[in-house]
Amino acid sequence: MAITRWFFSTNHKDIGTLYLVFGAWAGMVGTALSLLIRAELSQPGALLGDDQIYNVIVTAHAFVMIFFMVMPIMIGGFGNWLIPLMIGAPDMAFPRMNNMSFWLLPPSFLLLLSSSGVEAGAGTGWTVYPPLAGNLAHAGASVDLTIFSLHLAGISSILGAINFITTIINMKPPAISQYQTPLFVWAVLVTAVLLLLSLPVLAAGITMLLTDRNLNTTFFDPAGGGDPILYQHLFWFFSHPEVYILILPGFGMISHIVAYYSGKKEPFGYMGMVWAMMAIGLLGFIVWAHHMFTVGMDVDTRAYFTSATMIIAIPTGVKVFSWLATLHGGSIKWETPLLWALGFIFLFTVGGLTGIVLANSSLDIVLHDTYYVVAHFHYVLSMGAVFAIMGAFVHWFPLFTGYTLHSTWTKIHFGIMFIGVNLTFFPQHFLGLAGMPRRYSDYPDAYTLWNTVSSIGSLVSLVAVIMFLFILWEAFAAKREVASIELTSTNVEWLHGCPPPYHTFEEPAFVQVQAN
């Protein structure tokens, strides 16, 4: 019975749970890889061996965290669990395809881990640029296995995106317009559209790289009339939307958390929030070359990409100030999810400010491939996406399980994690401004102090991760059941109790919309 339930599931709640468990496991693998990186960099001199093994670890860390931790948890886990409940749908539009979307991920993960285990591993960085990723600099099957891994993860995401778009547009009650759905639903809708439009470009780029490596084509080889810069354009046309794919569901979750713990019926500026997400989604597609300021673009091209990148700060600012306006005048409940949300707003804004710095092509020429860039994207991912995930998990855990997490320990966990990530990544701004380059396993001893501080911070974060596992165990051991839920009229996912029954909305929901 258990085998058929979990392997052949067509239930959105079960598949969401599978995604959450898989993402948590992958997150621990990715954390272990990051600790190896920080151990290597904690002092000058070699620890793990040569630069190849170091860069294999860096590459695997990036792929694991992006494709097997953040995306499965945010989109697969919370998306599957919450979206049918939030729109009153009995399940996803294509339940069996939903199951396939999940079960493509473990084989994909296996291929990625295999790529590290054969030959010398894929030490290309997650960008997999040729000619380093070509069949001379990376002979053997490692890069090919990485490419196949990305193909499977990409198919999984495309199928999931089709499923979410269809579900959200088609499975609402007839009386509900798209502009009456919760913000998390909007966030996942925009995310799904971004995935659907950007992933095929990545698939094309890495397939061309595969044929360059194995079938003697020369798409990226100047000797045969190709151009390695073409690969960069294809890769970043996917990977810039990808970073918005990683953060947009987080925006949606933060909107729900901030409104709920401010005691508000709805977030401030609902329509502004929706249009801001759509604007971010659109602008995310027309700024990709800001990752390529150092390849020798025309000055007018650089001027355009600088300006377009800065424009994204406007809808992002709309969202940040709307969250602050939602908090304003609220009856604030100081519970752990709100702490994660407040941490998110502050740290995501800091990461956004360093992003504005890097948007300037002239400054980016100097800062490109330094630790300043690493600090920037870890502020928006390690403290944006991850804080959103943690806040959402603590907020919706009672819905998923029927049990409550320990309120004091989750607050302590937040405090340790907050100190850990800031201690890890704030010093990296200094290293970058001092010119320390990325993706090197060793450094001159002038950089020792801040690298040591950063590595100590990573150990603090490790303590937080271990404490989180303890908090989970404690909740399931203590079995504190949920007493009551407030504000269910505007938080419809809670209407069926905690946890909700296996099948919800088996009959269509009756929705009466008041005329304004």
From Swiss-Prot:
Chain sites annotated for binding heme a3: 376
Domain of life: Eukaryota
CDD domains on file: Cyt_c_Oxidase_I
Residues in the Mitochondrial intermembrane compartment per record: 41-50, 118-140, 213-227, 287-298, 358-370, 434-446
Amino acids binding O2: 244
Compartments, record wording: Mitochondrion inner membrane
Catalytic activity: 4 Fe(II)-[cytochrome c] + O2 + 8 H(+)(in) = 4 Fe(III)-[cytochrome c] + 2 H2O + 4 H(+)(out)
A biological process term (GO) from this entry: mitochondrial electron transport, cytochrome c to oxygen
GO cellular component: mitochondrial inner membrane; respiratory chain complex IV
Transmembrane segments: 12-40, 51-86, 95-117, 141-170, 183-212, 228-261, 270-286, 299-327, 336-357, 371-400, 407-433, 447-478
Function: Component of the cytochrome c oxidase, the last enzyme in the mitochondrial electron transport chain which drives oxidative phosphorylation. The respiratory chain contains 3 multisubunit complexes succinate dehydrogenase (complex II, CII), ubiquinol-cytochrome c oxidoreductase (cytochrome b-c1 complex, complex III, CIII) and cytochrome c oxidase (complex IV, CIV), that cooperate to transfer electrons derived from NADH and succinate to molecular oxygen, creating an electrochemical gradient over the inner membrane that drives transmembrane transport and the ATP synthase.
Family designation: Belongs to the heme-copper respiratory oxidase family.
Name of this chain's protein: Cytochrome c oxidase subunit 1
Gene: mt-co1
